[in-house]
Structure formats: C-alpha cells, structure tokens
C-alpha cells in the first residue's frame, strides 16, 4: 500500500491531519480570516479539511488547495460539492514546494506539512511568496516537550523545544498574533484515531492482502507512538504576520 492511501484511511475519522479538535481549528481560522472575504491558500491541503471549514464558515471566502495526492484532491472536491462550496474552491495537483500563482493570497495555511518544504522555516519562506501585504500565515508543526530518544528523532525529525521554535520564527521576521499548543487529549485522540481508523479498515478486509498490510502499519505506528515519542512530542499552531513590510 502506498503512503498516500494509508494516510487517507488513517484520517477517515479525523480529517484534520493534525492533533487539533474542531474547536481549536475554528479558533485558529477565525484569527487568520478577519474580514470574511479573503483569498485563502492551503499548501499541502490533503483532503481539504481546513479549506472546507473556512469556506463553510465564511461565505465570502474563496480558496485554493495544493497537494501531490490525486486521491486526496478528489476527496476534497467531492466533499466541497456535498457542502455546496465547490464553486469557491480551486484544487491544484502539484508539489506544494514548487507551486506558483499569479495572484497573492490574504491567508496561507500549511499545517502539519513542513516535511514537504524541509522544515518550519522553509515552509514560512514558501508561504511568504504567496502572501499579500498584511496577510496571515497559519502554520502547525511539531516540537519536543521532553528530551526525545534517538528513535523518535529519526522518526519525526530534530525539532527544537517550544520556546526555541517560537524564537526561530520571530528571528525569521514573523510575529505570532495567535497560537495554540495541542493538549495531551488532542495529541492522544489524534494518534488513537489514526491507528484505530486504519486498523478498523484492515479488520473489515482481513482476508485481503491490503487488509493484512494495513493492520501491520497500524500496529507499527501505534507501537512507535506509545514507546518512542508519546511523552516527548508536542504540536504548536501559529497565526503569523510579517513583523515589517
């Protein structure tokens, strides 16, 4: 099974691909979308969960999403049509790091997709190329709450702690105007949902080759989370504006 399919199945019951509740997502979007008529871009949109919420909450917003997964984009398009917002959503099958647009955006999102750019600061650099003057960037990325094991670093990356993460963002020329640190409940709910949704899909197909493969992937992920990074990993979402210019 390819990783894109595994990710789609794992997020079936938690379409926001980050450890955030619906209420946390709503607050973050409300802090980034201030007028209600913004052009919004999501770099690494997956199934479009962030954009669907933005469009549903703000009838004047138009949005564009970029992702490398055709399957995820198809899901986003179908969900947008079902919600009656498809006419305000444009989807691009493209590498988010290489995407370009002729018009700037008032809000640029990239939550949980820093790996596509090579880290948090490169993500901000990419977002800035699409950002209109005075616009907002909403990013979400991991940090270490505690000293990580070597295995955890190998799995997830060499993050900083929370103060250093925010300091790096500020030193890069950005000012946080809002933020959210995911709670233990949000972090655990996300991981239980990820592994549980994938495992449930697999158990319903226990006699099929993909069923066994998916069940093994869910089991491996659950073990790595519980043993290697549950105590150390944290997640922060930041709403940012350029400090000058």
Go through each PLM region and give its residues.
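Conserved class I S-adenosyl-L-methionine
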Residues: 37-46
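Class I SAM-dependent methyltransferase SAM/SAH-binding core
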Residues: 49-97
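A short acidic, Gly/Pro-enriched loop at the edge of an enzyme's catalytic core
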Residues: 97-108
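A short glycine-rich, Lys/Arg-flanked "PGG" loop and its adjoining helix->strand segment in the class I
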Residues: 121-136
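Short, glycine-/aromatic-enriched active-site segment of Class I SAM-dependent methyltransferases
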Residues: 139-157
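Conserved alpha-helix/loop element of class I SAM-dependent methyltransferases that forms part
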Residues: 18-36
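Conserved Class I S-adenosyl-L-methionine
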Residues: 180-245
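A short SAM/SAH-binding and catalytic strip from SAM-dependent methyltransferases
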Residues: 107-120
């Amino acid at each position: 099974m390819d990783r894109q399919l595994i990710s789609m199945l794992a997020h079936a019951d938690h379409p926001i691909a980050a450890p955030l509740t619906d209420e946390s997502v709503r607050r973050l979007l409300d802090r980034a979308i201030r007028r209600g008529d913004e052009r919004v871009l999501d770099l690494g949109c997956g199934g479009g969960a962030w954009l669907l919420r933005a469009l549903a909450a703000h009838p004047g917003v138009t949005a564009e999403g970029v992702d490398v997964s055709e399957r995820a984009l198809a899901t986003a398009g179908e969900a947008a049509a079902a919600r009656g917002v498809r006419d305000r959503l444009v989807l691009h099958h493209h590498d988010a790091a290489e995407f370009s647009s002729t018009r700037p955006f008032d809000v640029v999102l990239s939550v949980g997709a820093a790996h596509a750019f090579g880290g948090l600061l490169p993500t901000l650099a990419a977002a800035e190329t699409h950002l209109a003057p005075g616009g907002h960037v909403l990013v979400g990325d991991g940090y270490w709450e505690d000293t990580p094991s070597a295995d955890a670093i190998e799995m997830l990356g060499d993050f900083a702690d929370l103060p250093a993460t925010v300091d790096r963002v500020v030193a890069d020329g950005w000012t946080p105007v809002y933020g959210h640190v995911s709670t233990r409940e949000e972090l655990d709910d996300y991981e239980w949902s990820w592994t549980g949704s994938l495992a449930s899909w697999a158990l319903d197909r226990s006699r099929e080759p993909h069923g066994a493969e998916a069940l093994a992937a869910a089991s491996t992920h659950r073990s790595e989370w519980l043993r290697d990074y549950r105590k150390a990993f944290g997640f922060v979402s930041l709403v940012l504006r350029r400090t000058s210019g």
